């Protein structure tokens, strides 16, 4: 579908044009009223002129609206023609016939995860599935913490990060330090109390100096710059302080690297916390249902085009366990490595999984069976001189 068709609708949209004409007519009528009040003898002449102008504006509005609706109707027909497809051509109901309970569970978890607790309770009841009590507690906690971050109240996030400090340190995460840093800067920008900021830093951030000393120093210097400015200007107004500092930095003369420290990105902090929270509990950052729907939306146009081509060529899709065309998904949707057997050059599947031999090299199960003559004899590894026994091979999970 050509984007020009949509641009044509935007160009013929009557909103601004009609408003401009009505404003012009209003101005003319007001001028005519003033003229009549000033010189009543011209009233009839002014009324005739106003009537003619009103009719002219009315006719212009009708033409503008008609032109717009013509473009809109044409675009609607183009949409119908473009998206006239039958999803039944690419359905695969057999894949879901025995998975209704799993699908219902995924839906309920999505509702809980989105915070739609009442809807989730009702769905579980009507679907006849048990409510995931542990997940409910986790998602309720996450919702409370995220709301705290949005309200710039970091008490709950810091408590959670402190409780999970061991996990975060093993993972190499700087979440707890980042939360403390945001709280330090946020408190200062609100209170403008530099001594309170120094005390907070000594009490709550000393334990992070081994790893984050340079950043702590940079943060405190940024606060000292702000404090210096307040002393020199004699003001202590906390209202929208960071935006005031940024907009007036030419006069304040604070180096840009310290301005950047003060400009807190709360949305990024929220995303960082949710990522670490979900990782700590073995959950994905995004709802699995979101991922499935988004991946399906990306694949749908390609599969529909493939189905159309196969219909024209009178062929059928006979592949099992794989698609006849490649679907390119974003890198964030790549969760598992794809293993290709060095012997058969085939990709591993659930039915033909990768197997690691005692020498450490990996081939797929079918290649292992063929090399060992159905497990009846020892065989030499295709890539090293070691001999192996099929029974010693173990499945590999990527």
Swiss-Prot record:
State the Gene Ontology terms under molecular function: ubiquitin protein ligase activity; zinc ion binding
Disulphide bridges = none
Principal EC category = transferase
Superkingdom of origin organism = Eukaryota
Chief place of localization: cytoplasm
Q: Any idea where the LisH domain is?
A: 99-131
Keyword line: Cytoplasm, Metal-binding, Nucleus, Transferase, Zinc, Zinc-finger
Q: Tell me the first and last residues of the signal peptide.
A: none
Which catalysed reactions does the entry list for this protein? S-ubiquitinyl-[E2 ubiquitin-conjugating enzyme]-L-cysteine + [acceptor protein]-L-lysine = [E2 ubiquitin-conjugating enzyme]-L-cysteine + N(6)-ubiquitinyl-[acceptor protein]-L-lysine
Subcellular location, record wording: Cytoplasm; Nucleus
Record-level GO BP terms: negative regulation of gluconeogenesis; proteasome-mediated ubiquitin-dependent protein catabolic process
Q: What does this protein do?
A: E3 ubiquitin-protein ligase component of the GID E3 ligase complex recruiting N termini and catalyzing ubiquitination of proteins targeted for degradation. GID E3 is regulated through assembly with interchangeable N-degron-binding substrate receptors induced by distinct environmental perturbations. Required for the adaptation to the presence of glucose in the growth medium; mediates in association with the substrate receptor VID24/GID4 the degradation of enzymes involved in gluconeogenesis when cells are shifted to glucose-containing medium.
Q: How does it assemble?
A: Identified in the GID/CTLH complex. In the absence of stress, the complex exists as an inactive anticipatory complex (GID(Ant)), composed of Gid1, the E3 ubiquitin-ligase Gid2, Gid5, Gid8, and the RING-like subunit Gid9, awaiting a substrate receptor to form the active E3 ligase complex. When cells are shifted to glucose-containing medium, the substrate receptor Gid4 is induced and becomes part of the complex, named GID(SR4). Additionally, Gid7 transforms the GID(SR4) E3 ligase core into a higher-order supramolecular assembly (Chelator-GID(SR4)).
Name of the protein in its database record? E3 ubiquitin-protein ligase gid2
Q: Which organism is it from?
A: Schizosaccharomyces pombe (strain 972 / ATCC 24843) (Fission yeast)
The uppermost taxa in this organism's lineage are:
Eukaryota, Fungi, Dikarya, Ascomycota, Taphrinomycotina
> What is the primary gene name for this protein?
gid2
């Amino acid at each position: 579908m050509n984007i020009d068709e949509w641009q044509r609708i935007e160009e013929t949209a009557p909103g601004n044009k009609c408003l401009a004409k009505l404003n012009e007519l209003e101005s003319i009528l007001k001028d005519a009223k003033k003229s009549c009040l000033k010189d009543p003898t011209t009233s009839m002449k002014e009324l005739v002129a106003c009537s003619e102008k009103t009719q002219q504006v009315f006719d212009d509005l009708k033409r503008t609206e008609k032109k717009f609706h013509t473009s809109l109707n044409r675009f609607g027909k183009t949409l119908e023609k473009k998206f006239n497809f039958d999803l039944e051509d690419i359905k695969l109901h057999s894949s879901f016939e025995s998975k209704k309970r799993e699908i219902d569970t995924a839906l309920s978890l999505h509702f809980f995860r989105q915070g739609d607790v009442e809807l989730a309770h009702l769905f579980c009841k009507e679907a006849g599935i048990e409510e995931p009590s542990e997940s409910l507690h986790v998602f309720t906690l996450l919702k409370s913490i995220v709301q705290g971050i949005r309200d710039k109240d970091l008490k709950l996030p810091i408590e959670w990060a402190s409780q999970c400090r061991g996990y975060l340190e093993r993972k190499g995460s700087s979440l707890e330090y980042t939360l403390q840093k945001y709280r330090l800067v946020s408190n200062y920008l609100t209170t403008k109390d530099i001594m309170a900021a120094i005390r907070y830093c000594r009490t709550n951030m000393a334990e992070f100096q081994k790893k984050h000393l340079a950043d702590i120093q940079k943060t405190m210097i940024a606060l000292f710059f702000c404090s210096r400015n307040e002393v020199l200007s004699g003001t202590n107004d906390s209202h929208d302080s960071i935006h005031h500092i940024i907009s007036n930095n030419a006069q304040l003369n604070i180096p840009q690297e310290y301005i950047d420290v003060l400009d807190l990105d709360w949305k990024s902090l929220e995303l960082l916390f949710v990522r670490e929270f979900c990782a700590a509990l073995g959950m994905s950052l995004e709802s699995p249902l979101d991922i499935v729907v988004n991946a399906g939306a990306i694949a749908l146009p390609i599969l529909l085009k493939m189905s159309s081509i196969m219909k024209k060529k009178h062929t059928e899709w006979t592949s099992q366990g794989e698609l006849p065309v490649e679907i390119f998904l974003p890198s964030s949707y790549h969760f598992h490595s794809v293993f290709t057997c060095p012997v058969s050059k085939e990709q591993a599947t659930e039915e033909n999984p990768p197997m690691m031999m005692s020498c450490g090299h990996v081939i797929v199960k079918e290649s292992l069976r063929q090399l060992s003559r159905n497990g009846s004899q020892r065989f030499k590894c295709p890539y090293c001189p070691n001999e192996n026994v099929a029974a010693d091979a173990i499945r590999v999970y990527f």
